């Protein structure tokens, strides 16, 4: 583990060769607690507003006939761990670095995907149901995927899965979204106003999280170039593979966009927690910043994705044919199966 040449900071407390970990200052510690609390509250409010765009009937339709969710499951716990494994082997990174890349690939989808799904006119009902199900299934799928893919480098038993954090994430997602769904059911006009405000707040929140992460962990920015490259390729691969798999499965374009975002947008906060619980300070020197790098590039590529879609919309307008629920009621309706799930049948 000594093949990195990083100059030690003057205030480093843990050093090994030419590598070091700087202690967290009191200011950073206080700032971290305050901002974590504020961001958690803001995230709950944003998810409440996103729930205001979810219809109970359609949401339950995805649960009863979970074809879209099944595609998302294949992407989340099939494509992402495998992609992480391929990247780790291809770049020949250190074992501990390979494990962290795989931890990222095995994490469930992040809530930011719900916000972005709204901005790209995705299927919000599918987005929320996919995020909820992937977080719930992560309780079993994360240990399984880590066991399968990491055993060539480490004993998977040394990796600590924070089940309490996963449970907290699930509650923080389900409760505000459920309240939002109720508001949308009872007061649809008010829900539209809440949604508009929340969507703007959500965009600001995504940028704020990235900026805060950069401030809090600026002492760990010196990291091996290979991890920067992997952190760049990984989210883009997730978005692309998720989109193409959904399209191959016969999903309409707006659901392909949704599945793509749900696949590439990982829960980086959960990954950071697992890394901190599983590795010593000396080991963190080599890997601690990777979740932040992934977070930055997943947001950057999502922003590019959004920009391309907005430009396309301005040139061609919204294609109403891909949104069954807003078609003229005089036209012959699609089958309820296709309306709810898109199935595996082509358009």
From Swiss-Prot:
Residues bearing PTM Phosphoserine: 336
GO molecular function, one term: bile acid:sodium symporter activity
Positions on the Cytoplasmic side per record topology: 51-83, 149-158, 218-225, 311-347
Basic and acidic residues biased stretches: 323-335
Annotated localization: Membrane
Topology in the lipid bilayer: Multi-pass membrane protein
Domain of life, per lineage: Eukaryota
One Pfam family cited in the UniProt record for this chain: SBF
Record-annotated membrane-spanning stretches: 30-50, 84-104, 128-148, 159-179, 197-217, 226-246, 290-310
Catalysed reactions, semicolon-separated: taurocholate(out) + 2 Na(+)(out) = taurocholate(in) + 2 Na(+)(in); cholate(out) + 2 Na(+)(out) = cholate(in) + 2 Na(+)(in); taurochenodeoxycholate(out) + 2 Na(+)(out) = taurochenodeoxycholate(in) + 2 Na(+)(in); tauroursodeoxycholate(out) + 2 Na(+)(out) = tauroursodeoxycholate(in) + 2 Na(+)(in)
GO terms for cellular component: apical plasma membrane
Annotated InterPro entries: BilAc:Na_symport/Acr3, Bilac:Na_transpt, Na+/solute_symporter_sf
Residues listed as glycosylation sites in the UniProt record: 3, 11
Stretches for region Disordered: 323-347
Topological domains, Extracellular: 1-29, 105-127, 180-196, 247-289
Alphabetical keyword list: Glycoprotein, Ion transport, Lipid transport, Membrane, Phosphoprotein, Sodium, Sodium transport, Symport, Transmembrane, Transmembrane helix, Transport
Membership in a protein family: Belongs to the bile acid:sodium symporter (BASS) (TC 2.A.28) family.
Record function comment: Plays a critical role in the sodium-dependent reabsorption of bile acids from the lumen of the small intestine. Transports various bile acids, unconjugated or conjugated, such as cholate and taurocholate. Also responsible for bile acid transport in the renal proximal tubules, a salvage mechanism that helps conserve bile acids. Works collaboratively with the Na(+)-taurocholate cotransporting polypeptide (NTCP), the organic solute transporter (OST), and the bile salt export pump (BSEP), to ensure efficacious biological recycling of bile acids during enterohepatic circulation.
NCBIfam families: bass
Assembly with partners or alone: Monomer and homodimer.
Protein name: Ileal sodium/bile acid cotransporter
Lineage: Eukaryota, Metazoa, Chordata, Craniata, Vertebrata
């Amino acid at each position: 583990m000594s093949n990195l040449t990083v100059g030690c900071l003057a205030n480093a407390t843990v050093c090994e060769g030419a590598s070091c970990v700087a202690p967290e200052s009191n200011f950073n510690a206080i700032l971290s607690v305050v901002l974590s609390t504020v961001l958690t509250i803001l995230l709950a409010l944003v998810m409440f507003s996103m729930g205001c765009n979810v219809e109970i009937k359609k949401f339950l339709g995805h649960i009863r006939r979970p074809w879209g969710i099944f595609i998302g499951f294949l992407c989340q716990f099939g494509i992402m761990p495998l992609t992480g494994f391929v990247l780790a082997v291809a770049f020949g990174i250190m074992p501990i670095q390979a494990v962290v890349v795989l931890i990222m690939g095995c994490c469930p989808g992040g809530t930011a995907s719900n916000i972005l799904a709204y901005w790209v006119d995705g299927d919000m009902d599918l987005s929320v149901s996919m995020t909820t199900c992937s977080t719930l299934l992560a309780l079993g799928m994360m240990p399984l995927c880590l066991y399968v893919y990491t055993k060539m480098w480490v004993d998977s038993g040394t990796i600590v899965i924070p089940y309490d954090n996963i449970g907290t994430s699930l509650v923080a997602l389900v409760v505000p979204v459920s309240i939002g769904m109720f508001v949308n059911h009872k007061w649809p006009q008010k829900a539209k106003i809440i949604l508009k405000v929340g969507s703007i707040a959500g965009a600001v929140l995504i940028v704020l999280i990235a900026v805060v992460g950069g401030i809090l962990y600026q002492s760990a920015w010196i990291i091996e170039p290979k991890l920067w490259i992997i952190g760049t390729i990984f989210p883009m691969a997730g978005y692309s593979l998720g989109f193409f798999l959904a399209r191959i499965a016969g999903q309409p374009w707006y659901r392909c966009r949704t599945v793509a975002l749900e696949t590439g947008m990982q829960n980086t906060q959960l990954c950071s927690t697992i890394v901190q619980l599983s590795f010593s300070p000396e080991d963190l020197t080599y890997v601690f910043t990777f979740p932040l790098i992934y977070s930055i590039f997943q947001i950057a590529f999502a922003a590019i994705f959004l920009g391309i879609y907005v430009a396309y919309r301005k040139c061609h307008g919204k294609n109403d044919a891909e949104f069954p629920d807003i078609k003229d009621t005089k036209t012959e309706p699609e089958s309820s199966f296709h309306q709810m799930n898109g199935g595996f049948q082509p358009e």
